[in-house]
Amino acid sequence: MIFTNAILVISALLPATVLSLQHTEDSLFPARCWPDPCAGITFQNDTYVCGDPRLGPVVLPQKFPLNNELRTYARFGALCPAEFLDKWATDVAPNGTYIYPPANGFALDTEEQPILGNATLPVGMKLDRFGSEYGTFLAPLGAPYIERSLPPSNLNTFDGMYPYNYHVYQVTKEFVVGLGPIAPWFEQPGMGTQFVTYTNVLGLIDDGYLRRLDESEYDEKVEYSNPYTPGPNQ
């Protein structure tokens, strides 16, 4: 309710701005979740949807390439926020944590075995991830967020140098990863490609296998992992 009331207060002061904010709020939740889409959620911080860090930031990126990667994102699928947490976290209460998929998030075959194999990433390949450099998951540059099966909290900013916790890298020495399709999870369809490394990303940087890229080094359409991702000027 506090989240909704904040929008209404701003509307009295900034009518033009609030139209955009109200549209943003409306589009966050399925219509059936109204009039109180945040029911059952403990408010903690107005940076986050319903005030809960697990539900991710209220404002999503507007700048290429992140706006394209999130263009098809429906944060909660057909669920209301409390239903989403009830399904995907250990508890709706703030102390609940997300439940992650088995088998490192790889899709499973008909015998419930993960579909993956080893692959060598070539020098020059560009990769990205939403998450800290202590993690071991990477994706082809520009993969849509819905294909990654990540929770909304992976979009939270912890370091101002990396808004939305987004990091881009280039392979500088060949290395081997586990490669395979991503299982559906967190109300997302998944089925993108993930690379699981055998040491964390920070270790790969320190050992010279990866280097961090600046924005100017990944701003061309041709660099992206799929042919349907528009470039920054489209």
From Swiss-Prot:
Knockout-associated phenotype: Impairs NADase cleavage in conidia.
Activity control: The catalytic activity is positively regulated by calcium via its binding to the calcium-binding site.
Name of the gene: nadA
Keyword Chloroplast: no
Domain TNT: 120-212
Enzyme class at the top of the EC tree: hydrolase
Binding-site residues for NAD(+), renumbered to this chain: F130, T136, R148
Glycosylation sites noted in the Swiss-Prot or TrEMBL record: N45, N95, N118
Chief localization: secreted
Protein's UniProt name: Conidial surface nicotinamide adenine dinucleotide glycohydrolase nadA
Amino-acid positions noted as binding Ca(2+) in the UniProt annotation, renumbered to this chain: S216, D219, E220, E223
Active site (record annotation): R129, Q194
Induction (free text): Expression is up-regulated during conidiation of A.fumigatus strains displaying high adherence to pulmonary epithelial cells.
Organism: Aspergillus fumigatus (strain ATCC MYA-4609 / CBS 101355 / FGSC A1100 / Af293)
